[in-house]
């Protein structure tokens, strides 16, 4: 290892290697030359003292003054492995999704939030020209104006506040306990509308410790592909609207419960239009010891001009517990899911019914990385064929 030697020490060594006589002579000459300069500095010192240097830039600003915009970026990623008895979905090692969250304070009352995802394609390199290896998607893009805690108005592309999971756990598998979302609110799923493009009004009211929160919005309905929001405009000119209300009571810290109503008109192939009404309810206890989440959603479809309607229903129940030993790094969990499709539901006709049980364990390797392992068993359709498999995930935030 090279030892650090200050420059002054090196210079002193060189001088010591010279003759003593030369050193003394040089010193006398230097003193003679420095004397006039020293006198000049002493005479000018009072003048310099009367003109102090200007204060630094940050000292000139007012104490409460902020600089805008202020941008913060955080990222999430995951890598997966899957093996199943019967072929269904990706198997082997699978590159997960890379997500970037961007939050920017534009002023004391205006904020922006954006979310971009990069998802690997199964058909990468095929076609002419060849498809790219990833789909790049603007998941959320919201600008919000805050009047106060009771009134906030925003515009953009949201995760639809139609249930609890969709607004509690965004893109980034590290954020949630389990490897995957529940089937009823899967990204790319069709049972509930995951994204919403429009305007939203929200706020919170203390209400004697009940801490009531509300959201109300209007925007474009589902696109021709049910899993897509109307990013480029409403497909039929009939706006969707929603209301959401929930409570976080002070008396039961960690508890949140509420519900939502979503109304839309869906245009199917052949220009057939169906009225859609979604009602949902949930309760969530997020204290880690335990973590309990239960949600129910019912979707009603009725073709315009017809008296026949259908109701499809789905729910899930999830329980987890953060174990005290080993610095609370281990968190076992269980989830049961059910999706029931009405035989008369023409909109959801392609969707199979589902019953699934998941047993898993999350291990937080550090504050910013985790590993998850799951065993799943499930049936689809009429339930005659049962599948099961093992799943593993490494996820992180940066």
Description of each model-found segment:
Residues 1-30:
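N-terminal secretory signal peptides that target proteins for export/translocation
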Residues 31-46:
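Bacterial N-terminal signal peptides
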Residues 47-51:
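Boundary at the C-terminal end of the N-terminal hydrophobic targeting segment
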Residues 59-224, 237-239, 246-253, 316-322, ...:
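Outer membrane beta-barrel
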Residues 83-88, 129-133, 142-146, 154-157, ...:
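Outer-membrane beta-barrel pore domains
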Residues 211-213, 225-231, 269-270:
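A short secondary-structure junction signal
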Residues 223-231, 387-393:
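C-terminal/domain-terminus segments
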Residues 230-238:
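Interfacial loop-to-helix transition and helix-capping segments at the boundaries
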């Amino acid at each position: 290892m090279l030892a650090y030697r200050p420059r002054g020490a090196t210079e002193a060594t060189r001088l010591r290697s010279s003759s003593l006589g030369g050193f003394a002579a040089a010193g006398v000459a230097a003193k003679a030359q420095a004397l006039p300069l020293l006198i000049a500095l002493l005479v000018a010192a009072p003048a310099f003292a009367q003109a102090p240097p200007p204060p630094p830039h940050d000292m000139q600003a007012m104490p409460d003054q902020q600089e805008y915009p202020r941008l913060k970026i955080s990222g999430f990623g995951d890598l997966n492995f899957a093996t199943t008895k019967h072929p269904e979905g990706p198997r082997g090692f699978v590159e997960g999704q890379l997500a970037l969250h961007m939050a920017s304070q534009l002023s004391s009352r205006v904020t922006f939030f954006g979310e971009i995802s990069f998802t690997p394609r199964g058909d990468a390199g095929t076609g002419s020209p060849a498809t790219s290896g990833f789909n790049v998607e603007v998941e959320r893009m919201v600008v919000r104006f805050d009047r106060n805690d009771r009134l906030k108005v925003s515009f953009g592309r949201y995760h639809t506040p139609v249930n609890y999971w969709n607004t509690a756990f965004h893109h980034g598998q590290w954020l949630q306990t389990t490897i995957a979302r529940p089937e009823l609110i899967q990204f790319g799923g069709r049972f509930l509308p995951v994204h919403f493009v429009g305007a939203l009004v929200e706020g919170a009211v203390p209400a004697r410790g009940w801490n009531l929160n509300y959201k109300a919005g209007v925007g474009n309905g589902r696109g021709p592909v049910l899993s897509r929001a109307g990013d480029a405009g409403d497909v039929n000119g009939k706006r969707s609207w929603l209301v959401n209300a929930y409570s976080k009571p002070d008396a039961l810290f960690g508890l949140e419960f509420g519900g939502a109503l979503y109304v839309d008109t869906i245009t199917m192939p052949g220009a057939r239009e169906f009225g859609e009404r979604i009602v949902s309810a949930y309760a969530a206890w997020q204290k880690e010891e335990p973590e309990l989440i239960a949600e129910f959603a019912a979707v009603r479809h009725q073709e315009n001009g017809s008296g026949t309607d259908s109701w499809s229903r789905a729910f899930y129940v999830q329980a987890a517990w953060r174990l005290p030993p080993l610095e609370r790094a281990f968190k076992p969990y269980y989830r049961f899911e059910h999706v029931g499709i009405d035989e008369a539901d023409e909109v959801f006709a392609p969707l199979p019914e589902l019953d699934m049980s998941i047993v898993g364990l999350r291990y937080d390797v550090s504050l910013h990385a985790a590993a998850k392992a799951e065993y799943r068993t499930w049936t689809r359709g009429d339930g005659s064929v049962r599948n099961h498999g093992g799943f593993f995930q490494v996820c992180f935030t940066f």
